[in-house]
């Protein structure tokens, strides 16, 4: 029992030395969390032995010591991973590597250079909330670290990661509690972001724009099909189709002969005879084996870079994407899709490429 107070005193002395030194060396911050973990371990053991006081300190409950030890381990591991990147020498203080900073949104990322954004709910100066945005957010993956800048719009605070807009603060969540009218203003850097025009007032213009874009796409496809006359032809009436399905719905014969469709894509449709994957022909299109890699977007980004060193083991690989829905879904998980020429190539890929346990592998097929 005598050794626990002595060891605890030594650990706490070292922690105080780090506080007084106030170093911006990352190794010092790693040491700080190592010592914090050891302090919690000693408190845990003391309580287990029935010790209630060590000097003037009350020994906390075992559950408290265990929880704080887990937090210290989490910070220590994150800092050790950061220490392996090119940003290890940027200068890191105790405040920047504190538990409070680690838990601030976006959680479990290191952040620097915060600034305040004020949201005025109901356009009432007495009904405001302050939020912190960050000029530097360190997205720490398994093999690399990327710095992104926090941004703001009417809907919340966000950053871009691998082409994906990720909100880490949504003002609508607080609006449910503090807002009556459902309208607010965002004040940042002397500028005010107000509520955008309602969807209903723009329905006509939005529809017209969509139709215009579709028309332009069709025209472009028509040119790229390769007709001898490169001038755009005016729209013509479709020929009466002469193929009928079970519901008396008719389709042009030329679509079933694998000819290119001007108003769809420039690739055209692949017939059953043209498809190399004859075992999976459906609706006259060619299907290919695929896998979906599902997990944390940063882990997927890192994995995608590793996969690119095995280009002979797949055909195409997508950027990180995710499902969007009005229902409650975990949009924080990203998905990367990889296509293969055949089943043999997919199996060879899975045998060769090491995929982390944190990434879920979903096999399937996709029409191309």
Swiss-Prot record:
UniProt GO molecular function: DNA binding; DNA-binding transcription factor activity; nucleotide binding
UniProt GO BP: DNA replication; DNA-templated transcription; regulation of DNA replication; viral DNA genome replication
Assembly, per entry: Binds DNA as homodimer. Interacts with protein E1; this interaction greatly increases E1 DNA-binding activity. Interacts with protein L1; this interaction enhances E2-dependent replication and transcription activation. Interacts with protein L2; this interaction inhibits E2 transcriptional activity but not DNA replication function E2. Interacts with protein E7; this interaction inhibits E7 oncogenic activity. Interacts with host TAF1; this interaction modulates E2-dependent transcriptional regulation. Interacts with host BRD4; this interaction mediates E2 transcriptional activation function.
The protein's role, per its UniProt record: Plays a role in the initiation of viral DNA replication. A dimer of E2 interacts with a dimer of E1 in order to improve specificity of E1 DNA binding activity. Once the complex recognizes and binds DNA at specific sites, the E2 dimer is removed from DNA. E2 also regulates viral transcription through binding to the E2RE response element (5'-ACCNNNNNNGGT-3') present in multiple copies in the regulatory regions of the viral genome. Activates or represses transcription depending on E2RE's position with regards to proximal promoter elements including the TATA-box.
Positions of the UniProt region annotated as DNA-binding domain: 287-368
Top-rank taxon, per record: Viruses
Family according to the record: Belongs to the papillomaviridae E2 protein family.
Covalent cross-link Glycyl lysine isopeptide (Lys-Gly) (interchain with G-Cter in SUMO), where: 294
Post-translational modifications reported in the UniProt record: Phosphorylated.
Name this polypeptide is given: Regulatory protein E2
Residue spans crossing the bilayer: none
Keyword terms, alphabetized: Activator, DNA replication, DNA-binding, Early protein, Host nucleus, Isopeptide bond, Phosphoprotein, Repressor, Transcription, Transcription regulation, Ubl conjugation
Cellular component per GO, a single term: host cell nucleus
Disordered: annotated span: 225-255
Upper classification of the organism: Viruses, Monodnaviria, Shotokuvirae, Cossaviricota, Papovaviricetes
HAMAP family tied to this protein: PPV_E2
Region of interest: Transactivation domain: 1-200
Localization per record: Host nucleus
SUPFAM superfamilies: E2 regulatory, transactivation domain, Viral DNA-binding domain
């Amino acid at each position: 029992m005598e050794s626990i107070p002595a060891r605890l005193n030594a650990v706490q002395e070292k922690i105080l030395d780090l506080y007084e030194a106030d170093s911006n060396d990352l190794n010092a911050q790693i040491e700080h969390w190592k010592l914090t973990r050891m302090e919690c371990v000693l408190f845990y053991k003391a309580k287990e032995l029935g010790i209630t006081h060590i000097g003037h300190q009350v020994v906390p409950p075992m559950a408290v010591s265990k929880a704080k030890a887990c937090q210290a381990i989490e910070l220590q591991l994150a800092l050790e991973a950061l220490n392996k990147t090119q940003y290890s020498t940027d200068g890191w203080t105790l405040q920047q590597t504190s538990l409070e900073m680690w838990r601030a949104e976006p959680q479990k990322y290191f952040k620097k250079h915060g600034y305040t954004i004020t949201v005025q709910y109901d356009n009432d100066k007495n009904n405001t909330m302050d939020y912190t945005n960050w000029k530097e957010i360190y997205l720490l993956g398994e093999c690399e670290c990327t710095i992104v800048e926090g941004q703001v719009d009417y809907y919340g605070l966000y950053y871009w990661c691998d082409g994906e807009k990720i909100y880490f603060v949504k003002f609508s969540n607080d609006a449910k509690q503090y807002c009556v009218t459902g309208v607010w203003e965002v004040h940042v850097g002397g500028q005010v972001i107000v509520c955008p025009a309602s969807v209903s007032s723009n329905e006509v213009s939005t529809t017209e724009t969509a139709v215009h874009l579709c028309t332009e796409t069709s025209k472009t496809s028509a040119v790229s099909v390769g007709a001898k006359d490169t001038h755009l032809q005016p729209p013509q009436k479709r020929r009466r189709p002469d193929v009928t399905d079970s519901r008396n719905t008719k389709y042009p014969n030329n679509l079933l002969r694998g000819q290119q469709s001007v108003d769809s894509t420039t690739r055209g449709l692949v017939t059953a005879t043209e498809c190399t994957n004859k075992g999976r022909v459906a609706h006259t299109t060619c299907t290919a084996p695929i896998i979906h890699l599902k997990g944390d977007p940063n882990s997927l980004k890192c994995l995608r870079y590793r996969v690119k060193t095995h280009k002979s083991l797949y055909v195409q690989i997508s950027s990180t994407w995710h499902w969007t829905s009005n229902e409650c879904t975990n949009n924080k998980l990203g998905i990367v899709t990889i296509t293969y020429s055949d089943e043999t190539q997919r199996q060879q890929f899975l045998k060769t490429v090491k995929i982390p346990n944190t990434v879920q592998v979903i096999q399937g097929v996709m029409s191309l």
